[in-house]
């Protein structure tokens, strides 16, 4: 899937020294400086395109855009991936409610989102992946999890069983019950 038009980044004056960037590390429960690396990988969850984007979306993408720009300004390579959930219950429900084809609704909202990102001058991801185009990978992963006994069913929907993952909660510090 195509993302949006790239944004020109003017060169940073070589005399400018960037301060160290610290980020919250949920696993260690504190702010820690980013390690110095040549390559950083960023993944950001994208929208479910059933309605117009809003300030909450903008806040997320602007936050990651700042981190992306900071890393590039430090001379690092950044591999930035973002998904888009272009098939999901809220999208299907909105399409049914409005009497429109869900694919057309998704496409129209994706175009609006792209326009918003261009207007906000957000750097586009290197890879912009829709769920529809990744469906074979998704169904294969679900099949593997089901074969391992790592899923359970409620009303014909499959859910991941957090009890199947001994490390569940190790980064978030959440108990299985939470």
Residue ranges and their predicted role:
Residues 1-178:
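NTP-dependent nucleotidyl-transfer catalytic core
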């Amino acid at each position: 899937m195509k993302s949006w038009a790239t944004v020109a980044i003017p060169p940073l004056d070589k005399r400018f020294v960037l301060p160290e960037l610290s980020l919250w590390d949920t696993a260690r429960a504190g702010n820690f400086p980013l390690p110095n690396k040549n390559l950083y990988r960023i993944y950001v969850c994208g929208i479910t395109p059933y309605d117009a984007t809003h300030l909450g979306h903008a806040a997320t993408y602007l936050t990651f855009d700042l981190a992306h720009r900071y890393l590039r300004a430090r001379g690092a390579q950044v591999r930035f991936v973002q998904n888009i959930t272009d098939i999901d219950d809220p999208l299907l429900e909105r399409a049914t409610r409005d009497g429109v084809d869900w694919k057309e609704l998704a496409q129209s909202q994706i175009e609006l989102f792209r326009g918003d990102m261009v207007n906000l001058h957000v750097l586009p991801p290197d890879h912009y992946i829709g769920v529809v185009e990744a469906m074979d990978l998704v169904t294969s992963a679900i099949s593997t999890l089901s074969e391992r006994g790592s899923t359970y069913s409620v009303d014909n929907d499959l859910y991941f069983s957090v009890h199947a993952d001994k490390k569940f909660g190790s980064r978030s510090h959440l108990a299985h019950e939470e």
